[in-house]
């Protein structure tokens, strides 16, 4: 039996539009982002997908994308499992900074390392910073030592994988069709795990906003196939635009 999993990056957020490092800052969708969420839902409907379960982060750009997509699928009733483990990678002291200005200051290669390397985190956010997650009530029930002040993709993967093993994988093994609506780097982490992508290859992977990525999996959850829904060229261009965000103007 083929298991179906869709990974969906949230639609364009205000800070995507502004080209700023977002991380765990709770920025909402733009109108374009809301249109992308609806378009993602239409693509999934045209594919004939109906979901048994949905997962998302605790950040509203992902939650609102999920809601917009489910509305197009006429599955507004589907409950969403929300977990901080699906949050975007924490960008530490870079959060809120303009990516192009940061590239002009530190060099494009350094910014590419911070954005796309596997195990090198950005400079950390200080505990005293009011933006640190230890001061956010949505994380109040968690061990403060588990809450990051910065993350690499490697530590993001370490955060995401327990949720995959405990929540998502058992549902797929039970034959459920699963939708995960999350963020560029939490989804890159899952993509790396599912496809056994090398540390070097993951550097070049960019996930576009609002385009569903369909995985077909075997019983043991090894990958049969994966593809973006809709126009492949549109997905390629959207991923290329993500790659260009870290370049100086």
From Swiss-Prot:
Pathway: Carbohydrate degradation; glycolysis; pyruvate from D-glyceraldehyde 3-phosphate: step 3/5. Transmembrane segments: none annotated. The active site is at 10 (tele-phosphohistidine intermediate), 88 (proton donor/acceptor). Keywords: Gluconeogenesis, Glycolysis, Isomerase. The record marks 183 as: Transition state stabilizer. SUPFAM superfamilies: Phosphoglycerate mutase-like. The keyword Transferase does not apply. The keyword Isomerase applies. Its EC number is 5.4.2.11. Substrate binds at residues 9-16, 22-23, 61, 88-91, 99, 115-116, 184-185. CDD domains: HP_PGM_like. GO terms for biological process: gluconeogenesis; glycolytic process. It holds the Pfam family His_Phos_1. InterPro entries: His_Pase_superF_clade-1, His_PPase_superfam, PG/BPGM_mutase_AS, Phosphogly_mut1. One of its GO terms (molecular function) is phosphoglycerate mutase activity. It catalyses: (2R)-2-phosphoglycerate = (2R)-3-phosphoglycerate. It comes from the Bacteria. Homodimer. Catalyzes the interconversion of 2-phosphoglycerate and 3-phosphoglycerate. Belongs to the phosphoglycerate mutase family. BPG-dependent PGAM subfamily. PANTHER family: PHOSPHOGLYCERATE MUTASE (PTHR11931). This is 2,3-bisphosphoglycerate-dependent phosphoglycerate mutase. The gene is gpmA.
């Amino acid at each position: 039996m083929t298991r179906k999993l869709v990974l969906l990056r949230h639609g364009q957020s205000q800070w995507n539009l502004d080209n700023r490092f977002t991380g765990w800052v709770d920025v909402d969708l733009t109108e374009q982002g809301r249109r992308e969420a609806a378009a993602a839902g239409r693509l999934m409907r045209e594919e004939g997908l109906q979901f048994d379960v949905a997962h998302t982060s605790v950040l509203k750009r992902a939650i609102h994308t999920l809601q917009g997509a489910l509305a197009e699928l006429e599955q507004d009733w589907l409950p969403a499992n929300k977990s901080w483990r699906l949050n975007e990678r924490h960008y530490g002291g870079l959060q809120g900074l303009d990516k192009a200005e940061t590239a002009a200051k530190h060099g494009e290669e350094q910014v590419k390392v911070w954005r796309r390397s596997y195990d090198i985190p950005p400079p950390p956010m200080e505990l005293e910073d009011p933006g640190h997650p230890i001061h956010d009530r949505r994380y109040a029930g968690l061990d403060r030592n588990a809450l990051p002040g910065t993350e690499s993709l490697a530590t993001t993967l370490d955060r995401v994988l327990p949720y995959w093993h405990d929540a998502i994988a058992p549902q797929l093994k039970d034959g459920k069709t699963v939708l995960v609506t999350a963020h560029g780097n939490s989804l890159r982490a899952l993509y790396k795990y599912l496809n056994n992508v090398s540390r070097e290859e993951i550097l070049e992977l960019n996930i576009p906003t609002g385009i569903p990525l369909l995985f077909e999996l075997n019983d043991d959850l090894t990958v049969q196939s994966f593809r973006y829904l809709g126009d492949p060229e549109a997905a390629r261009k959207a991923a290329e635009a993500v790659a260009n965000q870290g370049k100086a103007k």
